[in-house]
From Swiss-Prot:
Belongs to the UPF0223 family. This is UPF0223 protein SUB0967. HAMAP family: UPF0223. It comes from Streptococcus uberis (strain ATCC BAA-854 / 0140J). InterPro entries: BH2638-like_sf, UPF0223. Disulfide bonds: none annotated. The lineage of its organism: Bacteria, Bacillati, Bacillota, Bacilli, Lactobacillales. NCBIfam families: PRK04387.1 (NF003353).
Length: 92
């Protein structure tokens, strides 16, 4: 995994939408690199889903992000739902 990777962003998104998607992806990064609050990750995911309403686009973003970073948005969200409250880590 490289420390320098690209985020899967859509050029048609507004600045606010890009900021919200980046916030979600940063929460996923925190889950792998340190610890993240499950509620904060799920809240950022909720906002992300308001922007990315298509399941196929969500899966594409997850694939692209995991390919470039090694981090899975799907696994992070599943773990946050499992934990519900408090902090968790997916660090290796």
């Amino acid at each position: 995994m490289s420390d320098n990777y690209n985020y899967p962003l859509d050029i048609n998104w507004s600045t606010d939408e890009i900021t919200s998607v980046l916030h979600f992806l940063n929460q996923v990064e925190k889950a792998y690199e340190s610890k993240v609050d499950a509620n904060q990750l799920l809240e950022s995911y909720r906002v992300f889903k308001e922007i990315v309403t298509s399941k196929s686009q969500e899966k594409q973003i997850d694939r692209e992000f995991e390919k470039s970073s090694g981090y899975s948005t799907y696994r992070a969200v599943q773990k946050a739902k499992e934990v519900e409250k408090g902090y968790f880590s997916l660090g290796r």
